[in-house]
Curated annotation (Swiss-Prot):
GO terms for molecular function: flavin adenine dinucleotide binding; tRNA binding; tRNA dihydrouridine synthase activity. This is Probable tRNA-dihydrouridine synthase 1. It catalyses: a 5,6-dihydrouridine in tRNA + NAD(+) = a uridine in tRNA + NADH + H(+); a 5,6-dihydrouridine in tRNA + NADP(+) = a uridine in tRNA + NADPH + H(+). FMN binds at P48, L49, S50, Q102, K171, N232, G233, D234, S256, R257.
Amino acid sequence: MGKCSYRFISLQTLTPNSLLDHSPNPTIWAKPLQIGSLTLHSRVLQSPLSGVTDLVFRRLVRRYAPQAMLYTEMVSATEIHHLRTLPQVMEIDPRENPISIQLFDCRPDFMAEAAQKAVAQGAQSVDINMGCPVNKITKKGGGSSLLRQPAVAEAIVKTVVAAVDVPVTVKTRLGWDDGEINIVEFAQRLQDAGAQMLTLHGRTRAQGYNGRARWQWIAKVKQALTIPVIANGDIFSVEAAIACLEETGADGVMCSRGSLGYPFLVGEIEHFFKTGEKRKAPTVAEKLTCAQEHLQMLWEYKGQRGLFQARKHLAWYCKDFPGAAALREQLFQINSVQEGKDLLDQAISTAKLCL
């Protein structure tokens, strides 16, 4: 059976326990992962997501995934250079460890300065964003535009590595578009420059988040490198994580969009990797209770700005249950914390009656 066929079957018909039988070495998923001087006791990572992975979101993920690597939202090195005080997105709670701050820019000197400030804030590693596909980032020479500037990318890694005493890692994509998939050579240059881990999203910049992640390219990069390679893209379940590792041979997986409105995902995968058992999924009432807590925490942490940001998070929680669409629409328009809590209280009561 070819790998593409296996991937389809693994996601559709195989249980997590039967997937263990298909893996050449499932026990490796429970072993620590060494990233330079940093030892990770989980092979599941929560992706940095702009406007999402703030301190509040990370606390929720950490609750269910006690050992997974967490990341801040990506931070502009230029912004850090010009501001007298560090932006709130760089705030770290020591209880979050292991934690990394992700930076983006195209200027090696600014990146080195920002990396030093990140470490001073408590970051246990520094991640360099070379994959963001958003125009406002790429037009400034950051994110995935660095895939077209390998010499600059290499210089950034070398300069940051020389500036800090923690592991320096990179998150990137396959290439700019299908005509410029240069990831194997690009990844080798990053490794030679001193990067100590590479996270690879299996799509090009042109794809954005469309189509399926091409895990076969992650497998090619894994075979070409000696540093750890983390697979990213389409990790929406325990089953997907297992299928991805089986196909790619990667050293771990990074969850991104699968965690939106579902901060349980990283913990579910982490639990399975360590025990071989699938954790019971939260009920609708439990998910909505988590949403309610998310709302309250955002309000306490950010005030009115947190309330506005909460709308999208609350909407993400509302899926896969009767009445979800209507509740999502209502929550997206709330103007007070109490309004949101009342709507969620009603939905939680209804969900409990349906158990």
